[in-house]
Amino acid sequence: MFAIIETGGKQYKVQQGDVLKVEKLEANPGDVVEIDRVFAVSKDGELKVGAPTVEGAKVLLKVEDHGKGKKIIIFKYKPKKNYRRKQGHRQAFTQVRVEAIQA
């Protein structure tokens, strides 16, 4: 059984027990977050696709941890003008575990 969900503007294909990193959620570690933006659910070989979401379907995610991703460097410059700007960024994420898929 799997589901396709949306959180943080991104779509994920999840199964029960999966661990994934999503955009930062405002929840404490140990909390259970309910996602109701479920676009498709596959159960017993039957695929149910929503228009745009599947009615009554939800996915329960347990928050395990918060963190920051790998650092990326933003560097811009203008040639011949001695203009250089260097900036780093680390995107915040939340690590979650899929507890249940209800459809």
From Swiss-Prot:
It holds the Pfam family Ribosomal_L21p. InterPro entries: bL21-like, bL21-like_sf, Ribosomal_bL21, Ribosomal_bL21_CS. The keyword Nucleus does not apply. Transmembrane segments: none annotated. One of its GO terms (cellular component) is ribonucleoprotein complex. GO terms for molecular function: rRNA binding; structural constituent of ribosome. Keywords: Ribonucleoprotein, Ribosomal protein, RNA-binding, rRNA-binding. SUPFAM superfamilies: L21p-like (SSF141091). PANTHER family: 50S RIBOSOMAL PROTEIN L21 (PTHR21349), LARGE RIBOSOMAL SUBUNIT PROTEIN BL21M (PTHR21349:SF0). This protein binds to 23S rRNA in the presence of protein L20. Belongs to the bacterial ribosomal protein bL21 family. HAMAP family: Ribosomal_bL21 (MF_01363). This is Large ribosomal subunit protein bL21. The lineage of its organism: Bacteria, Bacillati, Bacillota, Clostridia, Eubacteriales.
